[in-house]
Amino acid sequence: LVVPWPRAISIRAALALTISHLLVQALKRMVNRERPDATALIRCPDRFSFPSGHATAALAVALSYALTWPGLAPLLVPAAVLIGWSRVALGVHYPGDVLMGQVIALATVAGVAMMW
């Protein structure tokens, strides 16, 4: 049995990541939600927080690979979710930013999986 990896699987993950990134950047510019007022523990790449790009990217890649290798899902998906919520702990996002980023990732991966 020959598995068509890494090319096909990587292309699907890259496509989901690219589409979700474009959606996140468009929403950030439309919503213009400022980051939390609390002192952030890290430097932010821009001043807008909604939705979280890190939460979106981590979950989009994790779900893309988990669809191909379901056995990896128990490792990849919780790690991606924790990456997203670490953004709240670091003071650079509100919980809603992370949640919406994760919803975007889920929808994007589902859309790419249906098309690819």
Placement of each model-derived feature along the sequence:
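Transmembrane alpha-helix/helix-exit interface in multi-pass inner-membrane proteins
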Residues: 17-34
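Helix-loop junctions at the membrane-solvent interface of multi-pass transporters
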Residues: 4, 30-31, 115-116
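Membrane-embedded catalytic cores of phosphoryl/pyrophosphoryl-handling enzymes
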Residues: 41-116
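Amphipathic alpha-helical interface surfaces
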Residues: 10, 22-27, 57, 61
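Interfacial segments of alpha-helical transmembrane regions
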Residues: 1-22
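Cytosolic, membrane-interface loops and tails of multi-pass inner-membrane proteins
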Residues: 31-44
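Hydrophobic alpha-helical segments, especially transmembrane helices
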Residues: 13, 29-30, 55, 88
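Residues at alpha-helix boundaries and short interhelical turns
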Residues: 4-5, 35, 69, 89
